[in-house]
């Protein structure tokens, strides 16, 4: 079904889907439309093969570091003379003055700090205004015990992005092949999560074209997968047996008219069946949807549009918009360890929900119909929850309902 209509990399399949624009240059190449924010649909595998055919034989696919050109000693002297002549001509000075400028202001004169000097210590005898402002700011922080959170999120984001940059695998068998495609995927917040849902990607993940859809599905981290079902006011010490991800394993991706369902486990259900039946019930004009197994398809097998919103659904009704923002060939500066992909490079930073009592620690419990709480629902850390709701013997005080709470900020 889906294998026959979407799995093949042949460029001829595209002709059945759309009329190629005169400037396309090839049916596997993504075509940008000026009035739209996304490309037209194209086959990922065919696009990658077309790209590799254009570059093959030119050395552009190599993942080896380009060697630094060796400069003979005689050429260095000649280059210095030419540089002196150019500087003398631009500045209107003599060759001797240009040579002196090169000796005094050359790159070899740029030095780091002296051995043992601490870059965090501001010297006393400085007349720089910026250092004076910095010193007063640091003194103010010590006096008021304030926490500087300026740019904390962006610093963390760039730290994640650079963590695996240029990393090589220890096992040569895990090396990414030359010409491999890398796709950038933005995972947005669940639709029911109102804050940031329209403009803040929840996660940005890099996936390889040869990886299966199930690998991306397992890499997406959502707080709804970690929820613990049940009411624990009478047994707060009881360890939960399962989290939602262990109980409800069904999920699907939706790309270009096809639902790719996760069917790896016997308990997995076809979550797309309800949507397909609703679409076909009154001829709603959506066309005929297809279904396929997520574990049977790689990203190279897909038809996609760059910049177009697709869907990832799990836990029955937790829906994430998925946007593929970029597709490119792997470069020698990328992470070349296949085992690290799908690679998380950006993650939105969230404020954690604090305990209502101490205002310090992250909430671990949420209560309803609580006679000890000023609001409903009310959030508590583990220590405050037990001190307020149980006696020294661990017996329950009063009437309330208690549920384990997983804070989204724990993913920071």
Curated annotation (Swiss-Prot):
Purpose: Part of the SNAPc complex required for the transcription of both RNA polymerase II and III small-nuclear RNA genes. Binds to the proximal sequence element (PSE), a non-TATA-box basal promoter element common to these 2 types of genes. Recruits TBP and BRF2 to the U6 snRNA TATA box.
Alphabetized UniProt keyword annotations: DNA-binding, Nucleus, Transcription, Transcription regulation
GO molecular function term, any single one: RNA polymerase III type 3 promoter sequence-specific DNA binding
Name the record gives this protein: snRNA-activating protein complex subunit 3
Gene Ontology CC terms: nucleus; snRNA-activating protein complex
GO biological process, one term: snRNA transcription by RNA polymerase II
UniProt-listed InterPro entries: snRNA-activating_su3 (IPR022042)
């Amino acid at each position: 079904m889906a294998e026959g209509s979407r799995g093949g990399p042949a460029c001829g399949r595209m002709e059945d889907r759309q009329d190629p624009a005169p400037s396309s240059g090839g049916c596997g190449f993504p075509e940008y439309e000026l009035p739209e924010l996304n490309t037209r649909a194209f086959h990922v595998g065919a696009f990658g093969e077309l790209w590799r055919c254009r570059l093959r034989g030119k050395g552009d696919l190599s993942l080896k570091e380009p060697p630094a050109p060796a400069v003979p000693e005689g050429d260095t002297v000649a280059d210095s003379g030419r540089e002196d002549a150019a500087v003398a001509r631009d500045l209107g000075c003599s060759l001797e003055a240009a040579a002196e400028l090169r000796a005094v202001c050359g790159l070899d004169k740029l030095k780091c700090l002296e051995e043992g000097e601490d870059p965090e210590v501001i010297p006393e005898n400085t007349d720089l205004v910026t250092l004076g402002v910095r010193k007063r700011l640091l003194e103010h922080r010590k006096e008021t015990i304030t926490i500087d959170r300026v740019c904390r999120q962006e610093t963390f984001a760039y730290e994640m992005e650079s963590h695996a940059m240029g990393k090589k695998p220890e096992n040569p068998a895990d090396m990414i092949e030359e010409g491999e495609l890398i796709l950038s995927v933005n995972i947005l917040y669940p639709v029911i999560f109102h804050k940031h849902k329209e403009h803040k990607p929840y996660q940005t993940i890099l996936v390889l074209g040869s990886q299966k859809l199930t690998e991306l599905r397992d890499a997406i981290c959502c707080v709804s997968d970690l929820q613990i079902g049940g009411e624990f006011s009478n047994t707060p010490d009881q360890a939960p047996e399962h989290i939602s991800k262990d109980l409800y394993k069904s999920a699907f991706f939706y790309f270009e008219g096809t639902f790719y369902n996760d069917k790896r486990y016997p308990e997995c259900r076809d979550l797309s069946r309800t949507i397909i039946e609703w679409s076909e019930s009154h001829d709603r004009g959506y066309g005929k949807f297809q279904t396929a197994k997520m574990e049977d398809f790689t990203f190279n097998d897909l038809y996609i549009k760059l910049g177009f919103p697709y869907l990832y659904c799990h836990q029955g009704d937790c829906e994430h918009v998925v946007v593929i923002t970029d597709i490119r060939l792997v470069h020698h500066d990328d992470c070349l360890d296949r085992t690290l992909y799908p690679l998380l490079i950006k993650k939105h930073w969230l404020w954690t929900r604090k305990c209502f009592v101490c205002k310090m620690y992250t909430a671990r419990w949420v209560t309803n119909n609580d006679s000890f709480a000023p609001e409903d629902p009310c959030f508590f850390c583990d220590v405050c929850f037990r001190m307020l709701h149980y006696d020294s013997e661990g017996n329950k005080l009063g009437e309330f309902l208690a549920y384990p709470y997983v804070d989204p900020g724990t993913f920071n």
